[in-house]
Structure formats: C-alpha cells, structure tokens
C-alpha cells in the first residue's frame, strides 16, 4: 500500500541461540520496497497455506527457486558457447537435486568453469572426463560449521550473486518453502566474491573431491603461505567492523540551491533617504523625594489564634498564654 515502508531480512540460517555459536551464515537486510512487498506476500500466503507462485526479486521454493537458478545456469552456458569466459561458484551444504546435477554436467561440457564448496551430501562426481571435467568440488571443515548458501554466476560481463536459505537437495527445491534473493549492491557483490575466492584458496581446512568420489586434503606447496579461509574471513570482517567504528560520522549534506531558485537581485538599488537631525532636548532634573517616617507596627495575635472560646466572649488559651508571657 502507498505510504508503507519495509525492512526485510533474508538470511541463509536462523537465529538459534545454540547453533549461532558454531554456524556461519549470511544475512541481508534491505529497505527495498519490492523485496519487502514480496516477503510480506510470502507470509500472507503461509497464513492461508498457499504457495507463492510469482515473484520478481525473491526466490521462493518450491515454485520459484530452482527454476530461477536453472535460468541463471542457462545464461552462463550460452555465454560460454559464445566464447566468453563464463564461470559459476556455488556454495551450499548439500546437493542431490537431479535437475541441477544434469544442468551442471551440461555447463561443464559447454566449457563453463564450475567451483563448488559443498560441506555435506554431494551426489555429483567432480572431474569425470567427458561429463564433469570442468567441475571442481571442495569441502571446508574447520573451527566453524559452514552453513551459508551463496550462488554466483558470471557470464563474461556481469556477476549475479544470490544468497538463499535452501540447498540443492530435492527436499529444499521441491518440498519446502525456502527463500533467496539476488544481491544487487556492487559493494556487497564484491564482498561476497572476496569471501568465495578466499575459501577457494584455503589450504588448511579444504579437501578436494577426485573423480572416484574420494577426498584429498589440500596441502600448501613449499614456500606457499597458509590460507585459512575461516579465520582469514574472521579477520577481514573484524577489520572492516573496526574501520567503520573508527571512521568519523558523516556530516549531513546541505541541499544545493540552484541558480534558478536563488532570489534575484534588483537591477537598481534605492538610494538611502537622508533624515534631518532634530535638536536634542535639555535633560530633565530628577524629582526630589522626601522620606516620611513609617508608622509604628503593633504586634497582634494571628487571625488563626481566635478559637471557638474567644468567639463566645472568653479569652482563648492562646490569648492567655500570650498575656502571661508579656508579664
């Protein structure tokens, strides 16, 4: 409705007080009107046990989640067929959806570079000749539990990034109500891209899948610096937070007055009018004041001292005490 404003939070996890000490997630808070209206519509549909069928900015499973991601993969595949450097980076917990797996095989055969960071269940083989030779899968297991979902698609021109609550499991894409959103802020896109690249360089907690389905721990080459994706990301976010606290508060911008809005000056200025000087009046003599002696003040009993006995002609207790003290 007109006049309404929304603040919407879309996250890859929840606010569980126990798991929040271990899980790492991503949260997107926005005042975007379109996202707010669509999120409100999702809750209204849930209240009447109805599925959300149409959205413009949000991903909403089971009807508008997988289809959007498959469209993004098709866009990258078409870019690769045109000879552009196309790639995808997909980070989630698990993958088992058959449609997505087949689309990843198609993308790999088209020459798309695919990097996946999958912590748990993974039903697709990496680096299989003729099928997934351009698909590379790694898992990160370290101090924190990787729980975030980030889906990045690059078509050789632009990078489109989504965060979502749902994995690539069939139960998420077809059987649950999951949500996601495309991140359009260039600063946030760069930050998420940096996080993904940092985890792809990890040589402390990472294990990579081989063609036979086994995993091999990634080790740093001789002389290569150690990269701990989790702790380096912690340092990155901490430094960014401290830099924000140390930065001086921005002063409010003053509205710029356009030349057309400024008051125009008159072409001819009026000459000042001369006023004839008036002769000064002689100073008046101060009036003399004679002091008169003040009348003597006699003490009298307070009005409240007159009690009921005095009203009947008898001296009151207060009057008798007053007379005794004056003796």
Positions of the model-derived regions?
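Prokaryote-biased recognition of long, low-complexity C-terminal linker/tail segments
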Residues: 21, 34-52
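PLD/PLD-like phosphodiesterase catalytic module centered on the HKD motif
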Residues: 1-20, 29-36, 62-327
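Gly-rich Lys/Arg/Thr-decorated short loops/hinges at beta-loop-alpha junctions or inter-strand turns
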Residues: 49-58, 83-85
């Amino acid at each position: 409705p007109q006049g309404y404003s929304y603040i919407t939070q879309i996250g890859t996890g929840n606010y569980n007080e126990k798991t929040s000490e271990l899980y790492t997630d991503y949260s997107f808070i926005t005042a975007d009107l379109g996202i707010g209206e669509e999120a409100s519509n999702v809750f209204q549909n849930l209240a009447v046990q109805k599925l959300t069928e149409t959205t413009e900015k949000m991903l909403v499973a089971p009807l508008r989640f997988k289809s959007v991601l498959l469209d993004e993969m098709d866009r990258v595949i078409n870019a690769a067929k045109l000879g552009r450097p196309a790639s995808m980076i997909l980070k989630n917990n698990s993958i088992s959806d058959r449609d997505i797996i087949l689309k990843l095989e198609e993308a790999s055969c088209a020459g798309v570079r695919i990097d996946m960071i999958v912590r748990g269940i993974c039903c697709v083989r990496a680096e299989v000749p003729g099928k997934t030779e351009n698909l590379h899968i790694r898992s990160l297991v370290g101090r924190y539990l990787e729980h975030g979902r980030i889906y990045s698609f690059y078509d050789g021109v632009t990078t489109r990034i989504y965060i979502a609550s749902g994995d690539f499991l069939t139960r998420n894409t077809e059987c649950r109500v999951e949500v996601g959103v495309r991140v359009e802020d260039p600063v946030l896109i760069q930050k998420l891209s940096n996080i993904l690249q940092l985890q792809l360089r990890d040589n402390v907690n990472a294990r990579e899948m081989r063609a036979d389905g086994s995993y091999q721990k990634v080790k740093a080459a001789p002389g290569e610096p150690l990269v701990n994706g989790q702790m380096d990301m912690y340092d990155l976010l901490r430094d960014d937070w401290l830099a924000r606290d140390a930065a001086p508060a921005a002063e409010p911008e003053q509205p710029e007055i356009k030349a057309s809005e400024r008051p125009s000056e008159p072409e001819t200025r009026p000459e000042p009018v001369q006023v004839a000087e008036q002769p000064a009046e002689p100073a008046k003599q101060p009036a003399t004041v004679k002091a008169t002696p003040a009348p003597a003040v006699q003490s009298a009993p307070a009005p409240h001292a007159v009690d009921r006995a005095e009203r009947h002609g008898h001296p009151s207790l207060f009057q008798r005490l007053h007379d005794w003290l004056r003796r």
